[in-house]
Design a protein with these regions (language model features):
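Hydrophobic alpha-helical transmembrane segments
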Residues: 81-103, 121, 125
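Membrane-interface helix caps and helix-loop-helix hairpins in membrane proteins
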Residues: 106, 130-142
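Membrane-interface loop-to-helix entry segments
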Residues: 71-93, 140-152
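Juxtamembrane boundary at the C-terminal end of a transmembrane helix
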Residues: 199-213
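Hydrophobic cores of alpha-helical transmembrane segments in multi-pass inner/ER membrane proteins
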Residues: 2-3, 32, 89-95, 147-165, ...
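Membrane-interfacial, low-structure loops and terminal tails that flank and connect transmembrane helices
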Residues: 2-22, 165-185
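Extracytosolic (periplasmic/ER-lumenal) interhelical loops and adjacent juxtamembrane/interface segments
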Residues: 47-82
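N-terminal signal-anchor transmembrane alpha helix
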Residues: 22-50, 196-203
Length: 213
C-alpha cells in the first residue's frame, strides 16, 4: 500500500469517529482550566501564609468565608505540602486529555480506567475537604469550593465517557441501561442535585453570616 492509498483511507474515516464526545470533553476542558486557575490562586495563598500566617488574604471576607483560616488548617496540607499543589499537577493532565480527545486521539481503555480511578480519589478527597471545612474548621474557602465543583464536573464527564464507551467492561444489560440514562441527562441531573445539596448546606449554616443577617 503506497502513501497515496493510505491518505485516501485516512480521509475516508468519518470525522465523528475521530472526535467522540466533543461536548463532554469540552466540559472537561473548561472545568479543568477553571480548576487550574483556582489551584494556582490557592498555591499562591499557601506561599503567602507560609511566610506570614497572619496575612490578610483577599478572600478573608468574614467569619464564614475565610481562606486564611482554611489554609492554615492541617487539612489544607494533608500530605505535608499544600493540597493546591496537587491541582497544579492534575489539572494540566486533564487539560491535555481533553484537548487530545477533541483533536481525535483515541486513548486505550487502561489509560481511561486509570484516569477514572485517579479522579475518583480526587473526587472523594475534594468532598472530604468540604466536610472538614464545614463541620470541623468552621469556615469556607471560595476557591476550594470552586475546585470541589470543577472536580465533580470532570469526574462525572470522564465517567460518562467511560460508561458510554464501556471502558469499564460492564455487562451488556447494565451498560445499555446506564447508557440510556446518560443520554437522557441523568448525569447532569445528578451533578445539579449534588450542587444543590452543597448550596443548601452552606445556606443553612452560614446564610445569615454570608448575607449579613
Amino acid at each position: 500500500m503506497n502513501a497515496t492509498n493510505v491518505a485516501i483511507e485516512e480521509a475516508a474515516v468519518p470525522l465523528r469517529a475521530q472526535r467522540r464526545h466533543p461536548k463532554t470533553f469540552t466540559e472537561m476542558l473548561v472545568s479543568s482550566i477553571i480548576g487550574l486557575i483556582a489551584s494556582l490562586v490557592l498555591s499562591i495563598d499557601a506561599v503567602v501564609l507560609a511566610a506570614n500566617p497572619s496575612a490578610d488574604l483577599n478572600c478573608n471576607i468574614n467569619a464564614a468565608i475565610s481562606c486564611g483560616k482554611v489554609g492554615l488548617s492541617w487539612q489544607a496540607s494533608l500530605l505535608g505540602f499544600p493540597n493546591a499543589f496537587l491541582g497544579l499537577i492534575a489539572e494540566p493532565v486533564v487539560i491535555t486529555i481533553a484537548v487530545a480527545a477533541l483533536g481525535g486521539v483515541r486513548f486505550p481503555r487502561w489509560f481511561l480506567n486509570s484516569a477514572q480511578v485517579v479522579y475518583l480519589i480526587g473526587f472523594l478527597f475534594a468532598y472530604w475537604l468540604f466536610y472538614q471545612a464545614y463541620f470541623v474548621i468552621g469556615a469556607l474557602c471560595p476557591w476550594c469550593l470552586l475546585i470541589t465543583i470543577t472536580t465533580t464536573t470532570v469526574f462525572v464527564s470522564l465517567l460518562r465517557v467511560n460508561i458510554l464507551d464501556n471502558n469499564l467492561g460492564l455487562p451488556p444489560k447494565l451498560h445499555e441501561s446506564l447508557s440510556i440514562g446518560l443520554r437522557a441527562g441523568a448525569d447532569t441531573m445528578g451533578v445539579l442535585i449534588i450542587f444543590a445539596i452543597l448550596a443548601g448546606l452552606i445556606f443553612v449554616k452560614y446564610g445569615s453570616v454570608i448575607f449579613g443577617g
